């Protein structure tokens, strides 16, 4: 599923949005409208296994795994660049989307004029932290593991300190689903490459 926010008379640029895990691109409507006001056309897709792209088990990337999701992000960026010649293309990527963006930049950084990574980290560090917090028979599973150390009003307090935003996430039927067993290992499979200095050297120097 794709989304377009193009209520812009004289565009100054194009923004591609890559959303996070267990959510969907429609949640970025408020951001997209603000970017429209600033002169940017905004495009987004629901990743494999997410939002309106769910065709089976929610969160399932399919047999091709996380690498296919990364390829989707890169291909969508290329299509947007071709559809908007002469306009600078920017990538805004959140959480899981930011991990995909990190991979995309290893091979396709030239197509972007700037990148914003939100709610991001180094995959290797995140994997270690999740493993450390998931020890013992009473350890939380899935997204609940992120809420360790936070209050337990909904179980999703780790998302935001804004209770209204947390409540909106909890109420959204396309958000917060349990992750398939294969999803997390697939996500962290790219950690080694993303931490490799020789791979990082391929990113365009000076990319904002």
Each language-model region and where it sits:
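Structural cue for short, hydrophobic secondary-structure segments
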Residues: 17-20, 44, 92
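Alpha/beta-hydrolase active-site loop
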Residues: 62-82
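Alpha/beta-hydrolase-fold enzymes
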Residues: 98-174
């Amino acid at each position: 599923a794709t989304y377009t926010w193009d209520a812009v008379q004289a565009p100054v640029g194009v923004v591609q949005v890559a959303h996070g895990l267990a959510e969907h691109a429609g949640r970025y409507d408020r951001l997209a409208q603000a970017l429209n006001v600033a002169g940017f056309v905004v495009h987004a897709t629901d990743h494999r296994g997410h939002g309106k792209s769910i065709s089976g088990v929610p969160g399932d990337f399919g047999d091709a795994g996380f690498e296919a999701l990364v390829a989707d992000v890169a291909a969508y960026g290329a299509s947007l660049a071709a559809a908007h010649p002469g306009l600078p293309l920017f990538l805004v990527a959140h959480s899981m989307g930011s991990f995909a963006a990190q991979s995309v930049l290893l091979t396709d950084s030239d197509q972007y004029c700037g990148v914003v990574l939100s709610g991001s980290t180094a995959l290797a560090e995140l994997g270690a932290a999740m493993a450390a917090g998931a020890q013992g028979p009473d350890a939380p599973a899935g997204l609940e593991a992120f809420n360790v150390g936070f209050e337990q009003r909904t179980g999703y307090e780790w998302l935001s300190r804004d209770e209204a935003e947390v409540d909106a996430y909890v109420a959204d039927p396309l958000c917060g689903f349990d992750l398939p067993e294969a999803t997390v290992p697939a996500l962290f499979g790219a950690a080694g490459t993303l931490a490799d200095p020789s791979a990082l050297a391929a990113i365009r120097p000076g990319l904002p």
